[in-house]
Regions:
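Extended active-site neighborhood of metal-dependent phosphoesterases/phosphodiesterases
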Residues: 1-105, 187-191
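Short, flexible loop/turn elements at secondary-structure junctions
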Residues: 5, 9, 63, 80-83, ...
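Short catalytic/ligand-binding loop motif for oxyanion handling, primarily in non-cytosolic enzymes
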Residues: 9-14, 85-87, 126-129, 174-177, ...
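Short amphipathic alpha-helical interaction elements and helix-loop-helix interfaces
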Residues: 14, 65, 85, 109-113, ...
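Short, glycine/acidic-rich beta->alpha junctions
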Residues: 51, 142-146, 209-211
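Residue-level detector of short, conserved catalytic/binding motifs and their immediate flanks
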Residues: 57, 117, 164, 212-215
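His/acidic metal-ligating clusters that form di-metal
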Residues: 69-71, 75-78, 89-192
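Binuclear metal-dependent phosphoesterase catalytic core
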Residues: 181-259
Length: 259
């Protein structure tokens, strides 16, 4: 298990403190997730110390359970993007928690040929799929400075070259994002967003409904590359059973990484 904090993992929701601005509430805030929510069972070693800072960390795991040291590995870079979503805490206006600075430095670290990076977060970059005027990152500076800097990292060829995929949720919709090179328009990184188990969905505070679903990714454990995913959907209007729908496949989409 590789835990990532969500925007409802605080009370009140959406409020994550920034150590750079100080104030009440930050001291030992993230420690409590390790101690009281038992995340220390999964976030260990140096990753634990990173997490205590502001809820982000990276951790490298083998692609399969084995005693061999030469097995391919996945470096999970786990972000706390909840910082940028309706956060009521006083935030640094440029880079709350120095997370983007840390992300850039982490992606600059050299990788061996057998290691791939998967970036994981809850709140995704970009705009809400059903409302092109609603940027998901909305604080600080209305989210624009954060979203632009975030995008610049993954549009950069050298920084994104080792990133196999980015995985997010939050929007309760099955959708995706693409980061294109600003000059060549080449797709540098892909973001995959799974729908939600809960049927709740709100657009401008108006309740809507979605069919609950679960996504199961498959990957090549020899190369550490995500190959495909199955989307399992439970239609709310169905009287019996669960309908299994695998509607994004290599045979249909042509490529998992670039649509």
């Amino acid at each position: 298990m590789v835990p990532a904090l969500g925007n409802h993992d605080t009370f009140k929701a959406d409020n994550y403190p920034d150590f750079k601005t100080g104030g009440s509430g930050h001291e030992n805030f993230y420690d409590k997730y390790l101690e009281e929510a038992a995340l220390a069972d999964f976030i260990t070693g140096d990753a634990k110390e990173m997490f205590k800072k502001c809820g982000y960390y990276h951790m490298t795991k083998p692609t399969r359970r084995t005693q061999h040291e030469d097995v391919p590995k996945i470096k999970f870079v786990v972000l706390n993007t909840n910082l940028y979503y309706h956060n009521q805490y006083d935030l640094d206006p440029v880079d709350p928690c120095d997370q983007l600075k840390w992300l850039r430095a982490t992606l600059e670290e050299p990788l061996d040929n057998s290691t791939r990076v998967i970036v994981v977060g809850h709140v995704p970059p970009g705009f809400f799929a059903r409302d092109s005027y609603n940027m998901v990152f909305n604080v600080p500076c209305n989210g624009e400075c954060i979203n632009d800097e975030f995008a610049s990292i993954f549009r950069n060829k050298s920084l994104s070259s080792g990133v196999a995929a980015q995985l997010y949720g939050h929007d309760h919709l099955d959708t995706f994002r693409l980061f294109r090179d600003e000059v060549s328009e080449t797709v540098r990184s892909s973001v995959f967003m799974a729908a939600s188990v809960t049927p709740a969905l709100y657009l401008n505070n108006v309740p809507m409904g979605v069919n609950p679903s679960v996504r199961i990714y498959s990957y090549d454990d020899e190369r550490g590359i995500i190959m495909d995913y199955d989307q399992v959907i439970c239609p709310m209007k169905a009287v019996y059973g669960i309908i299994y729908s695998t509607y994004i496949q290599n045979s249909q989409a042509g490529s998992f990484t670039v649509f």
